[in-house]
UniProtKB/Swiss-Prot annotation:
Family annotation (InterPro entries): ADH_Ceratitis-type (IPR002426), NAD(P)-bd_dom_sf (IPR036291), Sc_DH/Rdtase_CS (IPR020904), SDR_fam (IPR002347)
Oxidoreductase among keywords: yes
UniProt protein name: Alcohol dehydrogenase 2
Signal sequence region: none
Organism placement in taxonomy: Eukaryota, Metazoa, Ecdysozoa, Arthropoda, Hexapoda
Gene name linked to the record: ADH2
Species, as recorded: Ceratitis capitata (Mediterranean fruit fly)
Length: 258
C-alpha cells in the first residue's frame, strides 16, 4: 500500500526507532501524519514537518495505559481527517522488575489501541481498510532468559497480531495486520537489558547479551517504514544486524472450525 495521500498514526513515534521511522515515512507524501507519544518533544515535531511541507504533522500527548486517552486520540484523528489508513503501534519499555507497567505498555496498551482503531478503519463500518503494524521484537519469537517479562509481553503481541491478522478478519475488514520484530538496536531500551533484568542471577548473561553486535536505529527505522508499505496481511518481519527478513512461523497446531 503506497502511503501517498494517506493518513497515518504512529504510536510511540518519538522514541529512537520510532523517530527514525517517522523521518523515513515523511518522504512518502502522506496527507496527514499523527504522532502519539507520552514524550513531549516539539522540536522533533517541527523537524518532521520541515522534511515535507506536503504532509501535515500533528502531535498528540498520549497515555497508552489509559483507555480514555486512546479513545480520545483516535476520535480526534477521525474528526480531523475522517479516515485512518495506517496505524503503527510502537510504544514499548524494557524494565522487567516492573511487571505491571511492562505489560500495560507493551501488550495491553497495544491491544486496546488496536481494538479501538481497527473498527475505525474497517471498510464495512466507517473506514476504507488499511494496515496495522504492531511492533513486537525478536524476543517475541524466541525466549531470552534475562528479559523474561519483556519476552512475555512481546510473545503476547505476536499471538495477538497473528490472531487478528487471520485472513478471515482481513477479508471482512480490509485491514491488514503486520508484525515487525526488531533485533538488538542501539537504543536506551537495549541498554536496559544490562540493568533492568529479571533476576539478580540475570546480571552476567544480561551484560553479555548487551555487548553483542547491534544495528543503528536509522537502519531499523528504514526497515519499519518499508514494512508499513508492504500491506501484507499476516506478514512477520525481523530487522536484525542491518538485514530485513520475512519470517514464516512454525505451526504446531491449527484450530478447526465447523
Amino acid at each position: 500500500m503506497g502511503l501517498s495521500g494517506k493518513n497515518v498514526i504512529f504510536v510511540g513515534g518519538l522514541g529512537f526507532i520510532g523517530y527514525e521511522a517517522c523521518k523515513q515515512l515523511m518522504a512518502k507524501n502522506m496527507a496527514s501524519f499523527f504522532v502519539f507519544d507520552v514524550l513531549d518533544k516539539p522540536e522533533n515535531i517541527k523537524a518532521l514537518q520541515a522534511l515535507n511541507p506536503k504532509t501535515k504533522v500533528y502531535y498528540t500527548k498520549f497515555d497508552i495505559t489509559s483507555k480514555q486517552s486512546i479513545k480520545s486520540a483516535l476520535a480526534d484523528v477521525v474528526a480531523k481527517v475522517k479516515y485512518i489508513d495506517a496505524l503503527i503501534n510502537g510504544a514499548g519499555i524494557l524494565t522487567d522488575p516492573n511487571v505491571e507497567l511492562t505489560m500495560n505498555i507493551n501488550l495491553i496498551g497495544l491491544i486496546n489501541t488496536t481494538l479501538e482503531g481497527l473498527p475505525l478503519m474497517d471498510k464495512n463500518k466507517q473506514g476504507r481498510g488499511g494496515v496495522i503494524v504492531n511492533i513486537a521484537s525478536v524476543l517475541g519469537l524466541e525466549p531470552c532468559p534475562p528479559a523474561a517479562v519483556y519476552c512475555a509481553s512481546k510473545f503476547g503481541v505476536m499471538g495477538f497480531s497473528r490472531s487478528i491478522g487471520d485472513p478471515y478478519y482481513y477479508n471482512i475488514t480490509g485491514v491488514a495486520v503486520v508484525t515487525f520484530c526488531p533485533g538488538l538496536t542501539e537504543t536506551p531500551l537495549k541498554n536496559n537489558i544490562g540493568s533492568k533484568y529479571t533476576f539478580e542471577y540475570s546480571k552476567k548473561i544480561s551484560e553479555e547479551l548487551n555487548s553483542t553486535k547491534t544495528q543503528k536505529p536509522e537502519v531499523c527505522g528504514a526497515h519499519l517504514a518499508q514494512v508499513v508499505e508492504s500491506h501484507e496481511n499476516g506478514g512477520i518481519y525481523i530487522s536484525n544486524q542491518g538485514t530485513l527478513a520475512k519470517v514464516t512461523p512454525t505451526v504446531y497446531w491449527q484450530p478447526t472450525y465447523h
